[in-house]
Amino acid sequence: MADLENKTVKANVENKPGAAKTQSVSAPKRTESGAKKQIWEKRSAHDSKDMPKKSVDRANKVKNRTRFGEANNEFSEKVVNISRVTKVVKGGRRFSFSAFVVVGDKKGKVGFGHGKANEVPDAIKKAVKDARNHLISVPIQNKITVPHEIHAKFLASKVMLKPAPKGKGIVASGTVRAVVELAGYTDIYTKTYGSRSKANIVRATLKALQQLRTPEQIAEIRDKDVKDLLG
């Protein structure tokens, strides 16, 4: 292409009448390879080397979301209390709703959450999300009851948990029942003392469950054999 352009420039100069003889000026050469290289470099930023990594990352995120969704489907939830709250501001009063929710998988994991919103469903959703972010693991003796008797206190609320024989069922008030049932206990004695605040009773129950120890854990703490503890 460059040679043809040089010849045409020479022919035009020679054909003009009275034109002085001048040196032919060649047109600037096009660096087609350079242009192609630039295009290739631009494409290389989005070539197949980077795309698989992004696609793999996206696929992993989708898998993790799916697994998280499947894990969340295993959890059950119970609304402990819903109350209407008021906030006094300069323009007057603002009303909203407060919700307390307990979630658990009935396999040894349970959590308690609080949510506040202008509508009841939104408050419950926030409470469920908060509860799932504050899950605890609790021991279940023989898959039915607590390993031993335990007492716990939160502010003015007190709770007692005691093992029960198989077939006895859950002997508890509605607030404590929601916690122990979602935790996975099927036979247990409970008793509440002091303040009847539902939120405080739930927190006292969770505090008691956190203090539970399996025979293996107690034997390890005392540096003894499990058989010696159980007699």
UniProtKB/Swiss-Prot annotation:
GO terms for cellular component: small ribosomal subunit. The keyword Ribosomal protein applies. Residues 75-138 form the S5 DRBM domain. GO terms for molecular function: rRNA binding; structural constituent of ribosome. With S4 and S12 plays an important role in translational accuracy. Belongs to the universal ribosomal protein uS5 family. This is Small ribosomal subunit protein uS5. It comes from Mycoplasmopsis agalactiae (strain NCTC 10123 / CIP 59.7 / PG2).
